[in-house]
């Protein structure tokens, strides 16, 4: 504010001196008016430029890398469509139970995990018994997890366990998602989709569509009448 007043004062002083000089010289009224308008306009423009520059400098000095002088950070604004990032956690294999169920050592405790968003044909169901392609799905999962050097679990954003106490997660074997691999091979269907535990739903549906197109296993023609 002080610099602004100083600039305006200097301009007014210059204009006053010029006006006095023109008043005592042989200058016509027309020339006097033109020169007065020119100098007054120039003074106004100069004052506005200086004021704008000072204002910008003041605003810039209030922040430094997103932190104001009081030390508080500006809040991070997330879009309405942003999602919480999932992360994988290490586990070790105890055994593969069937196509969509494995038992792992997780955080020092044995825990049974049900693969999220997929359903494989049954092999041990008390009523359904052994369903077609059930043994193949079980063998596929068993081979995938037993041959892996690294097993990881990835929980979704919602419920982590089902009513039986089983963990609900995506299981990875050496970085490859077992859930997706089963669906891609036509050994599992996309099923039990409940928000918000559906982050990888579209990935699985894409793999399922490809398996259907290729008529793999449960989508094969010889399985069309089995109700699978």
Swiss-Prot record:
PROSITE patterns: TNASE_1, TNASE_2, TNASE_3. The active site is at residues 114, 122, 166. It catalyses: Endonucleolytic cleavage to nucleoside 3'-phosphates and 3'-phosphooligonucleotide end-products. The keyword Coiled coil does not apply. Residues 1-23 form the signal peptide. One of its GO terms (cellular component) is extracellular region. Its EC number is 3.1.31.1. Its cofactor is Ca(2+). Ca(2+) binds at residues 100, 119-120. Its main location: secreted. It is found in: Secreted. Residues 24-60 form a propeptide. GO terms for molecular function: endonuclease activity, active with either ribo- or deoxyribonucleic acids and producing 3'-phosphomonoesters; metal ion binding; nucleic acid binding. Binds 1 Ca(2+) ion per subunit. Keywords: Calcium, Endonuclease, Hydrolase, Metal-binding, Nuclease, Secreted, Signal, Zymogen. Belongs to the thermonuclease family. Enzyme that catalyzes the hydrolysis of both DNA and RNA at the 5' position of the phosphodiester bond. This is Thermonuclease.
């Amino acid at each position: 504010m002080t610099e602004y007043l100083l600039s305006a004062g200097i301009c007014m002083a210059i204009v006053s001196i010029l006006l006095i000089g023109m008043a005592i010289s042989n200058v016509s009224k027309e020339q006097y008016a033109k020169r007065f308008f020119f100098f007054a306009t120039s003074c106004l423009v100069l004052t506005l430029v200086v004021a704008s520059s000072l204002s910008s400098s003041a605003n810039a000095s209030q922040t430094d890398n997103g932190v104001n002088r009081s030390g508080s950070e500006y809040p991070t604004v997330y879009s309405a469509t942003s999602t919480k990032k999932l992360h994988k956690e290490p586990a070790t294999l105890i055994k593969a139970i069937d196509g969509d169920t494995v038992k792992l050592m997780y955080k020092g405790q044995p825990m049974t995990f049900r693969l999220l968003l997929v359903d494989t044909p049954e092999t041990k169901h008390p009523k359904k018994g052994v369903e077609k392609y059930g043994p193949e799905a079980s063998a596929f999962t068993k081979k995938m997890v037993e041959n892996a050097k690294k097993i990881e679990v990835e929980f979704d954003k919602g419920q982590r366990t089902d009513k039986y106490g089983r963990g609900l997660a995506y299981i990875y074997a050496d970085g490859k998602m077992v859930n997706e691999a089963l669906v891609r091979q036509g050994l599992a269907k996309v099923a039990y989709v409940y928000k918000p535990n559906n982050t990888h739903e579209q990935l699985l549906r894409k793999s399922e569509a490809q398996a259907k197109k290729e008529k793999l296993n449960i989508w094969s023609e010889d399985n069309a009448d089995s109700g699978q």
